[in-house]
């Protein structure tokens, strides 16, 4: 049973106990941090909690205004010299609850990878810092059609990375699209920006900032353009692709957990699968472009003082010397990763 289903099952059992105050039950995971499911009967609040040494300092003031979430920290009466961190979902919507369960399950998986209680608490806090944007925007609705298409493109390139000889953890870490970085994939010496467009839009693509195609600070910057056709049947759906990636990563626990974390913060939740299964993507064309020389782009250094947040469109009818083979791109990335 995966962690989010286990959490939902425990919540259901706690709810059926009909206790008005907060009740808790330990989650059975191999972790140095004690983790619990909680339920507050009088308000119908589902939650998770953590018990840890009172010697670990934790400031919850940055989390007091989280949308949909209530965070409390107090002395743990069940364990000596311990604190109790309680995180409760105050939104009763079923979809939001399922998403919260997925987030909690991801935390349960993640804290198993560290060897000290302090490290585990820091991991929990790190996840909480990301919740404001997630709960205020991405949990309210499913991904837009354009967001689904963009994610499909990013994950298609990600699949190429993890099917190469690249270390899978490094591959997952290089996917920085969910972090709102200028490019979708970035490491110390290379970056790849992915643009996924439908056939009727080719050859024009939208560039979202003056930094997106600015290669000034990196050794190699590539633009990967995927042209897709949207079909009611045939082709591959976004959930299909994600299931393939999960299967590839299944033997690498840390990489798999990191991938799930990034999926969540990209706004993808399994509870919305039925919506995403309505769109099938058939890949019509793929091209890679090395961003250099006469490749059409705006660079930050060319802007007048005070100009920023530039969005513009380019045509990919570019000189042939900018087009490179996929094998060239992957081999370059692998050579850089091997030399770091």
Question: What positions do the PLM features span?
Answer:
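Nucleic-acid endonuclease domains
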Residues: 1-180, 197-340
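Conserved catalytic cores of phosphodiester-cleaving nucleases, focusing on short active-site segments
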Residues: 161, 185-198
